[in-house]
UniProtKB/Swiss-Prot annotation:
InterPro entries xrefs: A-crystallin/Hsp20_dom, Alpha-crystallin/sHSP_animal, Alpha-crystallin_N, HSP20-like_chaperone
GO biological process, one term: negative regulation of cardiac muscle cell apoptotic process
UniProt subunit comment: Homodimer. Small heat shock proteins form high molecular mass oligomers containing variable number of monomers; these oligomers display a very flexible quaternary structure easily exchanging their subunits. Heterooligomer with HSPB1; formed through oligomerization of HSPB1:HSBP6 dimers; subunit exchange leads to formation of at least two different heterooligomeric complexes, differing in variable quantities of HSPB1 and HSPB6 homodimers in addition to HSPB1:HSPB6 heterodimers.
One Pfam family per UniProt: Crystallin
Protein family (similarity comment): Belongs to the small heat shock protein (HSP20) family.
Subcellular location: Cytoplasm; Nucleus; Secreted
Modifications made to the protein after synthesis: Phosphorylated at Ser-16 by PKA and probably PKD1K; required to protect cardiomyocytes from apoptosis.
Chain's role: Small heat shock protein which functions as a molecular chaperone probably maintaining denatured proteins in a folding-competent state. Seems to have versatile functions in various biological processes. Plays a role in regulating muscle function such as smooth muscle vasorelaxation and cardiac myocyte contractility. May regulate myocardial angiogenesis implicating KDR. Overexpression mediates cardioprotection and angiogenesis after induced damage. Stabilizes monomeric YWHAZ thereby supporting YWHAZ chaperone-like activity.
Protein name as catalogued: Heat shock protein beta-6
Example of a GO cellular component annotation carried by this entry: nucleus
Gene, per the UniProt record: Hspb6
Record-listed Phosphoserine modification sites: S16, S157
Record domain sHSP: where: 56-162
The organism of origin for this protein: Mus musculus (Mouse)
Length: 162
C-alpha cells in the first residue's frame, strides 16, 4: 500500500571528528547533498604545520539527519534547503517512509549543479502509517512525524452533528 504524504511549507550540528587533528570526510547520516568537502576535510590532507592557516571557523553548524523513535513516536528532521517544496515528495510505502527530492541542473556560484536524493526510514512497530505528516520550515528543514496507533485511538473523536 502506498500513501502519498503532502509536504507543506510552514540546527543540527555535524558530529565532531573521531580524533583531535583528524577530520573524517563525511558520515553516513550527513545530509549535505552535493555540497562538497569542507575546508577542514581538505586541510586534513595538508601537513599539520600549515593546516591551521587554511582553516576558517565555521559560521554555521552543518545540518544532519535527526531520527527519533522514542516510545513508538517517529520523527525525522532533514535539511532540504536546496530544494523547492514541489521538488520534494514524502510517501508511506508499507511500513516505510520514503523521501525523494530532485532538482534539474541549475546555475549556482560555482557553475551548474543538479541534486537528487532518496531516503527510506522504517516506521517503528505500533506507529500508524496513516498518521504520518510532513512539514517544511522556511529555513528548509523537512519534519516528518507520526504517533503510535494507540495514541491515535486515545484522541477524542469530534462531536456528532445533530
Amino acid at each position: 500500500m502506498e500513501i502519498p504524504v503532502p509536504v507543506q511549507p510552514s540546527w543540527l550540528r555535524r558530529a565532531s571528528a573521531p580524533l583531535p587533528g583528524f577530520s573524517a570526510p563525511g558520515r553516513l547520516f550527513d545530509q549535505r547533498f552535493g555540497e562538497g568537502l569542507l575546508e577542514a576535510e581538505l586541510a586534513s590532507l595538508c601537513p599539520a604545520a600549515i593546516a591551521p592557516y587554511y582553516l576558517r571557523a565555521p559560521s554555521v553548524a552543518l545540518p544532519t539527519a535527526q531520527v527519533s523513535t522514542d516510545s513508538g513516536y517517529f520523527s525525522v528532521l532533514l535539511d532540504v534547503k536546496h530544494f523547492l517544496p514541489e521538488e520534494i515528495s514524502v510517501k508511506v510505502v508499507d511500513d516505510h517512509v520514503e523521501v525523494h527530492a530532485r532538482h534539474e541542473e541549475r546555475p549556482d556560484e560555482h557553475g551548474f549543479i543538479a541534486r537528487e536524493f532518496h531516503r527510506r526510514y522504517r516506521l517503528p512497530p505500533g506507529v500508524d502509517p496513516a498518521a504520518v505528516t510532513s512539514a517544511l520550515s522556511p529555513e528548509g528543514v523537512l519534519s516528518i512525524q507520526a504517533t503510535p496507533a494507540s495514541a491515535q485511538a486515545q484522541l477524542p473523536s469530534p462531536p456528532a452533528a445533530k
